[in-house]
Protein backbone atom coordinates (compact mmCIF):
# COMPACT_ATOMS: atom_id res chain seq x y z
CA UNK A 1 0.00 0.00 0.00
CA UNK A 2 2.89 2.36 0.80
CA UNK A 3 4.37 1.78 -2.67
CA UNK A 4 1.06 2.74 -4.32
CA UNK A 5 0.93 5.98 -2.31
CA UNK A 6 4.52 6.82 -3.35
CA UNK A 7 3.68 6.20 -7.02
CA UNK A 8 0.63 8.47 -6.82
CA UNK A 9 2.71 11.21 -5.21
CA UNK A 10 5.40 10.94 -7.89
CA UNK A 11 2.83 11.11 -10.70
CA UNK A 12 1.15 14.14 -9.11
CA UNK A 13 4.48 15.95 -8.70
CA UNK A 14 5.42 15.19 -12.31
CA UNK A 15 2.10 16.60 -13.56
CA UNK A 16 2.52 19.80 -11.54
CA UNK A 17 6.06 20.29 -12.88
CA UNK A 18 4.93 19.76 -16.48
CA UNK A 19 1.99 22.12 -16.08
CA UNK A 20 4.24 24.86 -14.71
CA UNK A 21 7.03 24.37 -17.26
CA UNK A 22 5.58 26.68 -19.90
CA UNK A 23 5.53 29.77 -17.68
CA UNK A 24 9.10 29.11 -16.60
CA UNK A 25 10.08 29.40 -20.26
CA UNK A 26 8.34 32.75 -20.67
CA UNK A 27 5.52 33.96 -22.87
CA UNK A 28 6.07 33.62 -26.62
CA UNK A 29 4.74 36.34 -28.92
CA UNK A 30 5.03 37.20 -32.58
CA UNK A 31 7.32 40.19 -33.06
CA UNK A 32 7.49 42.69 -35.94
CA UNK A 33 7.09 46.46 -36.24
CA UNK A 34 5.65 48.52 -39.08
CA UNK A 35 5.29 45.69 -41.58
CA UNK A 36 2.64 45.35 -44.27
CA UNK A 37 -0.47 43.39 -43.29
CA UNK A 38 0.39 40.30 -45.35
CA UNK A 39 3.95 39.84 -44.03
CA UNK A 40 4.71 37.04 -41.53
CA UNK A 41 6.36 37.80 -38.19
CA UNK A 42 8.94 35.81 -36.22
CA UNK A 43 8.30 34.67 -32.65
CA UNK A 44 10.29 35.68 -29.58
CA UNK A 45 10.29 34.81 -25.88
CA UNK A 46 9.25 37.84 -23.83
CA UNK A 47 11.75 39.14 -21.28
CA UNK A 48 9.03 40.56 -18.98
CA UNK A 49 7.66 38.44 -16.12
CA UNK A 50 3.98 39.46 -16.55
CA UNK A 51 4.09 40.18 -20.27
CA UNK A 52 1.23 40.43 -22.74
CA UNK A 53 1.32 39.76 -26.47
CA UNK A 54 0.17 42.77 -28.47
CA UNK A 55 -1.29 42.97 -31.94
CA UNK A 56 -1.76 46.43 -33.45
CA UNK A 57 -3.19 47.65 -36.72
CA UNK A 58 -1.80 51.07 -37.44
CA UNK A 59 -3.31 53.45 -39.96
CA UNK A 60 -1.23 56.44 -41.04
CA UNK A 61 -2.95 59.26 -42.92
CA UNK A 62 -0.83 61.90 -44.68
CA UNK A 63 -2.49 64.35 -47.09
CA UNK A 64 -5.50 62.02 -47.54
CA UNK A 65 -3.23 59.06 -48.39
CA UNK A 66 -3.70 56.06 -46.11
CA UNK A 67 -1.16 53.39 -45.25
CA UNK A 68 -1.88 50.41 -43.00
CA UNK A 69 0.81 48.45 -41.19
CA UNK A 70 0.89 46.03 -38.28
CA UNK A 71 2.89 45.75 -35.09
CA UNK A 72 3.20 42.53 -33.13
CA UNK A 73 5.26 42.46 -29.95
CA UNK A 74 5.39 41.64 -26.27
CA UNK A 75 5.12 44.36 -23.69
CA UNK A 76 4.92 44.60 -19.88
CA UNK A 77 1.36 46.04 -20.08
CA UNK A 78 -1.46 46.51 -22.58
CA UNK A 79 -1.37 50.00 -24.16
CA UNK A 80 -4.53 51.92 -25.01
CA UNK A 81 -5.90 52.46 -28.52
CA UNK A 82 -5.01 55.75 -30.22
CA UNK A 83 -7.54 57.54 -32.39
CA UNK A 84 -6.87 60.55 -34.62
CA UNK A 85 -3.59 61.44 -32.95
CA UNK A 86 -1.72 64.16 -34.87
CA UNK A 87 2.05 63.74 -35.13
CA UNK A 88 3.96 66.14 -37.43
CA UNK A 89 1.09 66.46 -39.91
CA UNK A 90 0.32 62.74 -39.88
CA UNK A 91 -2.88 61.35 -38.39
CA UNK A 92 -2.30 58.07 -36.56
CA UNK A 93 -4.97 55.52 -35.59
CA UNK A 94 -3.85 52.47 -33.62
CA UNK A 95 -6.19 49.57 -32.84
CA UNK A 96 -4.58 47.43 -30.11
CA UNK A 97 -5.50 44.00 -28.77
CA UNK A 98 -3.66 42.15 -26.01
CA UNK A 99 -3.58 38.53 -24.86
CA UNK A 100 -1.60 36.30 -22.49
CA UNK A 101 -1.25 32.93 -24.26
CA UNK A 102 1.73 31.76 -26.31
CA UNK A 103 1.63 33.11 -29.88
CA UNK A 104 -1.89 34.47 -29.36
CA UNK A 105 -1.12 37.62 -31.38
CA UNK A 106 -1.13 35.69 -34.65
CA UNK A 107 -3.16 37.12 -37.55
CA UNK A 108 -5.39 34.05 -37.26
CA UNK A 109 -6.03 31.44 -34.58
CA UNK A 110 -3.16 28.96 -34.22
CA UNK A 111 -5.08 26.58 -31.99
CA UNK A 112 -2.59 27.14 -29.17
CA UNK A 113 1.08 26.41 -28.76
CA UNK A 114 2.62 22.97 -28.82
CA UNK A 115 3.36 23.23 -25.11
CA UNK A 116 -0.25 24.14 -24.33
CA UNK A 117 -1.59 21.17 -26.29
CA UNK A 118 1.03 18.89 -24.69
CA UNK A 119 0.03 20.07 -21.21
CA UNK A 120 -3.65 19.34 -21.90
CA UNK A 121 -2.79 15.87 -23.19
CA UNK A 122 -0.54 15.13 -20.20
CA UNK A 123 -3.16 16.38 -17.76
CA UNK A 124 -5.78 14.09 -19.31
CA UNK A 125 -3.42 11.09 -19.35
CA UNK A 126 -2.32 11.82 -15.80
CA UNK A 127 -5.88 11.97 -14.49
CA UNK A 128 -6.70 8.65 -16.18
CA UNK A 129 -3.53 7.13 -14.70
CA UNK A 130 -4.39 8.41 -11.21
CA UNK A 131 -7.91 6.98 -11.48
CA UNK A 132 -6.49 3.55 -12.37
CA UNK A 133 -4.17 3.71 -9.34
CA UNK A 134 -7.06 4.49 -7.01
UniProtKB/Swiss-Prot annotation:
Residues with covalent lipid (GPI-anchor amidated glycine) sit at 112
- Keywords per UniProt: Cell membrane, Disulfide bond, Glycoprotein, GPI-anchor, Lipoprotein, Membrane, Signal
Task: Kindly list the GO CC terms recorded for this protein.
Answer: plasma membrane; side of membrane
Instruction: List the PANTHER family hit by this protein, alphabetically.
Output: LYMPHOCYTE ANTIGEN 6H, LYMPHOCYTE ANTIGEN 6S
Question: What's the source species for this entry?
Answer: Mus musculus
Which InterPro entries does the UniProt entry name for this protein?
A: CD59_antigen_CS, LY6_UPA_recep-like, LY6H/LY6L_nAChR_modulators, Snake_toxin-like_sf
Q: Pinpoint the UPAR/Ly6 domain residues.
A: 27-119
Q: Where in the cell is it found?
A: Cell membrane
Q: Where is the signal peptide?
A: 1-26
Q: Which domain of life is it from?
A: Eukaryota
Q: Which CDD domains match?
A: TFP_LU_ECD_Ly6A_like
Q: Which Pfam families does UniProt cross-reference here?
A: UPAR_LY6
Tell whether S-adenosyl-L-methionine is among the UniProt keywords: no
- Disulfide feature: 29-53, 32-41, 46-74, 78-98, 99-104
Q: Which SMART domains match?
A: LU
Provide the residue ranges of the propeptide in this protein. Answer: 113-134
- Spell out the protein name for this chain: Lymphocyte antigen 6F
Primary location class: membrane
Task: Specify the protein's topology with respect to the membrane.
Answer: Lipid-anchor; GPI-anchor
The reply to whether Ribosomal protein figures as a keyword in the UniProt entry is no
